Amino acid sequence: MSRIDGRTPQQLRPVTIERGWSKHAEGSVLVSFGDTKVLCNASVTEGVPRWRKGSGEGWVTAEYAMLPRATNTRGDRESVKGRIGGRTHEISRLIGRSLRAVIDYKALGENTVVLDCDVLQADGGTRTAAITGAYVALADAVAWAQGRKLIKANRKPLTGTVSAVSVGIVDGTPLLDLRYEEDVRADTDMNVVCTGDGRFVEVQGTAEAEPFARDELNTLLDLATAGCTELAELQRKALDATLER
């Protein structure tokens, strides 16, 4: 199958992870999956939610939003509408769950890290790009907190890496990392979140048209794990680079 942008079915879009994008946030990453661009800012605060106080454990949570003109037609800001949409809540919770899968709460101490993931430009896979970029922003925020002794230097709050990618079946062909034009044509689409050692955090799959078979599910999961392995390596390379603060 010939894809719109010339990629093979097993190929990611060009992925870039730019650290230190905002000077104010303790961790800041602009992540790009092709034309999808998401700004991920991590903010560290001392203390935890009331229900967590006295536990000696920290907390990590996330919020997701799209800029009004992130898509080809303008959408109203949810703050103007006066309510947060169900999709926004769902994706915010997904990002938070994904990051918490690789957090040692005890090692984090009673500190809170909030990840704000704002979609600047959308071309499919915004939630998976957000998870992938937010992990790097979280890692930088943890390093910042350790440098300021909010977290003990000998502790390791991050137990591993986490990334995410979309997969789907379009015109009978399993594809990795769908663009918007592919996503809307997909008979089956799926978002897969993996740890760096290949375990699954979350698998969200839907048959938009024909139900999918077990062997097709296995093929999609194989595609996704291979994609997440590539993304984990890109995260590692990004974090290995020197970051000037």
Curated annotation (Swiss-Prot):
GO molecular function, one term: tRNA nucleotidyltransferase activity
EC number: 2.7.7.56
A GO BP annotation: rRNA catabolic process
Subunit structure: Homohexameric ring arranged as a trimer of dimers.
Superkingdom to which the source organism belongs: Bacteria
Uppermost EC category: transferase
Annotated function: Phosphorolytic 3'-5' exoribonuclease that plays an important role in tRNA 3'-end maturation. Removes nucleotide residues following the 3'-CCA terminus of tRNAs; can also add nucleotides to the ends of RNA molecules by using nucleoside diphosphates as substrates, but this may not be physiologically important. Probably plays a role in initiation of 16S rRNA degradation (leading to ribosome degradation) during starvation.
Organism annotation: Streptomyces coelicolor (strain ATCC BAA-471 / A3(2) / M145)
Classification via HAMAP family: RNase_PH
Protein name listed in UniProt: Ribonuclease PH
Keyword terms: Nucleotidyltransferase, RNA-binding, rRNA processing, Transferase, tRNA processing, tRNA-binding
Organism lineage: Bacteria, Bacillati, Actinomycetota, Actinomycetes, Kitasatosporales
Reactions it catalyzes: tRNA(n+1) + phosphate = tRNA(n) + a ribonucleoside 5'-diphosphate
Keyword rRNA processing: yes
Family: Belongs to the RNase PH family.
Residues where phosphate binds: R87, G125, T126, R127
Gene responsible for this protein: rph
